[in-house]
Amino acid sequence: MLRVATAECFTHGFVGREIHASASGYTGELGSEILGTELEGKVSVVAACFIPTVSGLRSLLGIDPPEPDEVSKSGAKAYREETDRKVAVMMARAVRERTGADVGIGTTAGIGRGAICLDDGEITLLGRTDVHANLLKPDERIRKRQLQGIKRSLVMFRAYFRCELDELLEEEWVEEVTRDLP
């Protein structure tokens, strides 16, 4: 059984929830629109964490992320896009290692497009949203970016689960792939 853990910021834990719904065979309102029941009995969610703050990243994941460019009124970190990409990788790797999962998924978005990372210790996939938004200036783009981030995270995980990485890499939103081959 494939074990997955998520450390999520702008996707608010919904990626882990959707994977769990599919793995549990939930249908209807409880089910996953994107994954269906494809993962039933084949995947286990070790943890699905919503971690919007730097202090949360430090205490829960044991990482030392860069200081945020800005901080929201609620204390949420707000990095610019380039730093979000680096932090998403840190989050995915740390949640995988910390929980003993086979796969870690990290998502974060502050100012710009959202960053999505999937890491299994050998393969690191880095994707992004197309939607630009600013966490410090909330408007409808925040929600659009979140929904696209959830969908793309699930599409990325599904491609990984199905061993369809070559097809995934044809998507323009998958920015980087690192394969550490023996």
UniProtKB/Swiss-Prot annotation:
This is UPF0254 protein MK0012. NCBIfam families: PRK00962.1 (NF002122). InterPro entries: HcgF (IPR009625). Belongs to the UPF0254 family. It comes from Methanopyrus kandleri (strain AV19 / DSM 6324 / JCM 9639 / NBRC 100938). HAMAP family: UPF0254 (MF_00673). The lineage of its organism: Archaea, Methanobacteriati, Methanobacteriota, Methanomada group, Methanopyri.
